[in-house]
Amino acid sequence: MQPLNMAEILDHRGVLTDGDDGPFRNLTNFYDMFSSNFPEGLRVLVFDEDPSYLLILERHLQKFQYQVTICNEVNKAMHTLRNHRNRFDLAMIQVNNAEGDIFRFLSEIGSEMDLPIIIISEDDSVKSVKKWMINGAADYLIKPIRPEDLRIVFKHLVKKMRERRSVVTGEAEKAAGEKSSSVGDSTIRNPNKSKRSSCLEAEVNEEDRHDHNDRACASSAKKRRVVWDEELHQNFLNAVDFLGLERAVPKKILDVMKVDYISRENVASHLQVTFLIYNIIVHFQQHFCFYS
């Protein structure tokens, strides 16, 4: 019997090509996602430098009826994440340390991606887990990965769908409210004005609105992404400790932190990530105590 040629297997299974981006996954269509056999058909990109372990991951994921594309070249994986995100529902990326191209990529644009990225690593240190999670990873799995952890990776897509649906709904409600308020205010302020006067005021208001929007856009463009360095994160933890878990809500945390360049939304997002990291660490401790 001839020895198994890993290179040939990888060349013929889940090849990354510059073709069709695959079926579009509408992340706002939350209920339609569950109308079929979801999570069967979940599209997963898996990168690992170890061809043997890559095939093990593929085999386990396929048992759960996931559509798996495997890759053992980091450049191909990065190219796909940048240019063909719509071909996948989530990505599982193996890393050796919290450095290099993958870390920079995730730190720079990971928060802007609709694609949940799960980190795979042999490093079980809390420091590594925290660094990746704070910088945009959806989850952190330690090798060797248990099949039951692979079975539920779809939860990260569900979370992403809920977030997108919440954002879209909020923006729609805000727009509808602003339109209703604008019409109501105009009617109350100008019930008896002549048609000419009303038209003139409408033109002035329209110019003011455009000027305000231009300033808002310019201000938004100048906003920088908040980097949660050790000092800022410690300030956050001190605020949570001061308030206590029962009272540690984003607005109160922000008041205690007294940092003018972060928003309530920034704090809310970081609070969610921090609790997620805590749950992962507890899971790791239970897992390794059980198997030790």
From Swiss-Prot:
Residues 43-158 form the Response regulatory domain. GO terms for biological process: cytokinin-activated signaling pathway; phosphorelay signal transduction system. Residues 168-215 are annotated as: Disordered. It comes from the Eukaryota. It holds the Pfam family Response_reg. SUPFAM superfamilies: CheY-like, Homeodomain-like. Residues 225-275 bind DNA. It is found in: Nucleus. GO terms for molecular function: DNA binding; DNA-binding transcription factor activity. Residues 179-191 have a biased composition (Polar residues). Signal peptide: none annotated. GO terms for cellular component: nucleus. Its main location: nucleus. Keywords: DNA-binding, Nucleus, Transcription, Transcription regulation, Two-component regulatory system. Belongs to the ARR-like family. Binds the target DNA as a monomer. Transcriptional activator that binds specifically to the DNA sequence 5'-[AG]GATT-3'. This is Putative two-component response regulator-like APRR4.
